[in-house]
Amino acid sequence: MRIVPEKLVFKAPLNKQSTEYIKLENDGEKRVIFKVRTSAPTKYCVRPNVAIIGAHESVNVQIVFLGLPKSTADDEMDQKRDKFLIVTLPIPAAYQNVEDGELLSDWPNLEEQYKDDIVFKKIKIFHSVLPKRKPSGNHDAESARAPSAGNGQSLSSRALLIITVIALLVGWIYY
């Protein structure tokens, strides 16, 4: 299994949603099933997060960074290193005639039963941070901020929280 690229960079501004793609290429002779896991499931949505790739075929995986609250400091982002783990398993002979949908839903059992055949590959995530600008003397820093929601949170951080909760509820984010 090849993963292109081997690392992802989400570009600033980090308080906005952004999307990157990885390509999973099955360079083997057997079909494989894969699952994508993340160390930060509330910050990312992955589609598809589990799928089957035929021999010598590839799949593009969409990774959506949901954005961070404006209060997150740049140095805090530098210290956090989000990661993705791509878990792959060649489809066992006993499952060759099983329909794809059933195979995908049986992933937890496959993972437990064939744990010695599983291959793990990590993808590191990096966030590019814009250089800090010095405020000019004529502009009021308060006027440059997003409108307040009334409780100290900006509307954008509230919207990100709502999107994350909805994503969790409809099953966009898997562990």
From Swiss-Prot:
<comment type="function">
    <text>Targets proteins containing a FFAT motif to membranes. Involved in regulation of phospholipid metabolism.</text>
</comment>
<keyword id="KW-1133">Transmembrane helix</keyword>
<feature type="transmembrane region" description="Helical; Anchor for type IV membrane protein">
    <location>
        <begin position="155"/>
        <end position="175"/>
    </location>
</feature>
<dbReference type="Pfam" id="PF00635">
    <property type="entry name" value="Motile_Sperm"/>
</dbReference>
<keyword id="KW-0812">Transmembrane</keyword>
<dbReference type="GO" id="GO:0061817">
    <property type="term" value="P:endoplasmic reticulum-plasma membrane tethering"/>
</dbReference>
<feature type="domain" description="MSP">
    <location>
        <begin position="1"/>
        <end position="125"/>
    </location>
</feature>
<dbReference type="InterPro" id="IPR008962">
    <property type="entry name" value="PapD-like_sf"/>
</dbReference>
<dbReference type="GO" id="GO:0008654">
    <property type="term" value="P:phospholipid biosynthetic process"/>
</dbReference>
<dbReference type="InterPro" id="IPR000535">
    <property type="entry name" value="MSP_dom"/>
</dbReference>
<feature type="topological domain" description="Cytoplasmic">
    <location>
        <begin position="1"/>
        <end position="154"/>
    </location>
</feature>
<protein>
    <recommendedName>
        <fullName>Vesicle-associated membrane protein-associated protein SCS22</fullName>
    </recommendedName>
</protein>
<dbReference type="GO" id="GO:0061709">
    <property type="term" value="P:reticulophagy"/>
</dbReference>
<comment type="similarity">
    <text>Belongs to the VAMP-associated protein (VAP) (TC 9.B.17) family.</text>
</comment>
<feature type="region of interest" description="Disordered">
    <location>
        <begin position="133"/>
        <end position="152"/>
    </location>
</feature>
<dbReference type="GO" id="GO:0005789">
    <property type="term" value="C:endoplasmic reticulum membrane"/>
</dbReference>
<dbReference type="GO" id="GO:0060304">
    <property type="term" value="P:regulation of phosphatidylinositol dephosphorylation"/>
</dbReference>
<dbReference type="GO" id="GO:0043495">
    <property type="term" value="F:protein-membrane adaptor activity"/>
</dbReference>
<dbReference type="GO" id="GO:0005886">
    <property type="term" value="C:plasma membrane"/>
</dbReference>
<dbReference type="GO" id="GO:0005829">
    <property type="term" value="C:cytosol"/>
</dbReference>
<dbReference type="InterPro" id="IPR016763">
    <property type="entry name" value="VAP"/>
</dbReference>
<dbReference type="InterPro" id="IPR013783">
    <property type="entry name" value="Ig-like_fold"/>
</dbReference>
<keyword id="KW-0472">Membrane</keyword>
<dbReference type="GO" id="GO:0090158">
    <property type="term" value="P:endoplasmic reticulum membrane organization"/>
</dbReference>
